[in-house]
């Protein structure tokens, strides 16, 4: 019997893949997943159950039962965390977090802005000598905050109700006014309050309804639903509008983010980058999300793409797409760098987070990832082991492994799961055979449990909550008994346990016959 035993081994990498046939995926891409929810590509290899979020910032002052309209991180202004919500009375819709009192302080506005009809407030940081950020909402004139003074931008030819804002080459750009959706306005140089042509301000008709603006290096990209253009130059004297494409556009305004040295956006056929190639002035557009293409077809049919919220988690080389409904499946996209110096995109899905708006940024050397919900509360992500005291559901299912021969029956004896745990963790493991054939017996669930994570001394202080390494034994062994041509494994949790990472899998099996 021992001479007949074989070992199948695969490292967990490649992420969620649903565009391959079963034989190709189970052979060439064995480390990928056919289902993956609330796992993320781990920095140390494998798939990690995501961290939780907590209501660090409580409820933003405002009218009862109204959503958070926008959140923002600006490290150099006040304590760095800001949120917008419709006020119960008056006009003070923007609030700053006070670290000392652990409460929200209303910012006194001017110009009588209203939040009636506002669905989202967008922000843009800039610094032309003093750190500030601009705000737009599609109902009121744009405004700025410098930590002391709220200023409406309603002079000269400034648009009355822009919904889009970008800072580019010492000018503030505004667009998205529903009364003139094709116009792109820019301020005078180094003066966001001056919108007079004599000072160098101006307006450009781009020829299509503007969906989003994004400055990137020495270019300002202007997205439409079916077009993309870019603006180059330094001021009104040499600004030039150039066409990128007239056959492709952006379907979700808040999907446009800078990520991994590029701009990415959601197009009708999935996630795309706007990438400069080696040829000067050339632009390359390629779909990044081919492995999960059918998911975006489902989104087009069942979700409001205009309501997508995107946030970047820089320390993990990761972006996240959210929908406001916590039962909707969002997307994690991440860059996985290989030991050979290469890199590729991997994807997973998210569920269980109600995200009406989100933002991220560094305050000091610490990254803050925050979001606001539909009831006025602001949360910090990447904190803790639960979703605001609720358990985190996670699911990872492998492809069906057929060990080089899909027609040869095997007898399966054991599964070794190489797992790093960040504390005491229980994971339910189940086995499926022969592509879910109802005539093949399905195994019962198996329980994996770690004995707890190791701790270490940090700055001469013993801290049992810090993690030095995974569970003392990185291998969880499970004896199984089954006979089939192929086998797939599912890992499921629904708990408040610490996170764990599934890094690799081995299966011990024996060769059978063909029948």
Regions of interest found by a model, annotated:
Residues 92, 220-245:
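Surface-exposed extracellular loop regions of Gram-negative outer-membrane beta-barrel proteins
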Residues 160-191:
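Carboxylate/His-rich catalytic cores and anion/metal-binding grooves
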Residues 98-101, 146-148, 190, 233-236, ...:
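Short loop/turn segments that connect beta-strands within beta-propeller blades
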Residues 121-155:
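Hydrophobic or amphipathic alpha-helical targeting/insertion segments
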């Amino acid at each position: 019997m021992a001479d007949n035993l074989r070992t199948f081994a695969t490292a967990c990498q490649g992420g969620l893949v649903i565009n391959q046939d079963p034989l190709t995926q189970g052979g060439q891409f064995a480390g990928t997943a056919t289902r993956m929810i609330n796992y993320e590509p781990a920095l140390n290899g494998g798939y990690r159950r995501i961290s939780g979020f907590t209501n660090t910032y409580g409820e933003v002052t405002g009218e009862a039962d109204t959503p958070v309209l926008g959140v923002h991180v600006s490290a150099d202004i006040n304590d760095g965390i800001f949120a917008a919500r419709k006020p119960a009375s008056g006009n003070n819709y923007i609030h700053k977090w006070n670290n000392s009192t652990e409460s929200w302080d209303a910012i006194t506005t001017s110009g009588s802005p209203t939040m009636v009809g506002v669905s989202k407030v967008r922000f843009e940081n800039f610094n032309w000598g003093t750190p500030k950020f601009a705000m737009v909402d599609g109902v009121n004139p744009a405004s700025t905050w410098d930590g002391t003074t709220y200023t409406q931008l309603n002079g000269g030819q400034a648009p009355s109700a822009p919904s889009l804002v970008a800072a580019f080459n010492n000018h503030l750009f505004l667009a998205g006014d529903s009364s003139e959706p094709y116009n792109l306005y820019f301020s005078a140089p180094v003066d966001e309050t001056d919108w007079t042509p004599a000072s160098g301000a101006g307006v450009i008709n781009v020829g299509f309804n503007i969906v989003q603006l994004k400055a990137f290096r020495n270019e300002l990209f202007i997205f439409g639903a079916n077009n993309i253009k870019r603006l180059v130059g330094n001021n009104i004297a040499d600004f030039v509008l150039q066409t990128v494409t007239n056959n492709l556009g952006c379907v979700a305004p808040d999907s446009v983010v800078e990520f991994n040295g590029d701009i990415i956006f959601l197009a009708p056929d999935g996630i795309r980058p706007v990438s400069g190639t080696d040829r000067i002035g050339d632009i390359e557009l390629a779909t990044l999300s081919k492995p999960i293409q059918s998911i975006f077809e489902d989104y087009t049919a069942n979700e409001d793409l205009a309501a997508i919220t995107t946030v970047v988690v820089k320390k993990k080389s990761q972006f996240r797409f959210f929908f406001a409904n916590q039962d909707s499946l969002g997307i994690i996209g991440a860059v996985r760098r290989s030991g050979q110096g290469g890199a590729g995109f991997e994807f997973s899905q998210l569920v269980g987070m109600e995200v009406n708006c989100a933002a991220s940024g560094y305050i000091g050397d610490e990254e803050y990832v925050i979001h606001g919900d539909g009831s006025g509360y602001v949360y910090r992500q990447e904190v803790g082991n639960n979703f605001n005291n609720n358990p985190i559901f996670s699911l990872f299912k492998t492809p069906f492994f057929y060990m080089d021969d899909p027609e040869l029956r095997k007898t399966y004896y054991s599964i070794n799961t190489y797992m790093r745990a960040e504390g005491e963790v229980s994971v339910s493991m189940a086995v499926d055979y022969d592509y879910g054939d109802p005539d093949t017996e399905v195994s019962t669930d198996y329980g994996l449990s770690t004995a707890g994570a190791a701790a270490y001394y940090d700055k001469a202080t013993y801290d049992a909550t810090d993690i030095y390494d995974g569970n003392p034994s990185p291998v969880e062994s499970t004896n199984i008994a089954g006979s089939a041509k192929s086998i797939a494994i599912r890992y499921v949790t629904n708990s408040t346990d610490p996170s764990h990472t599934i890094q690799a899998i081995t299966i011990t099996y024996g060769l059978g016959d063909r029948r």
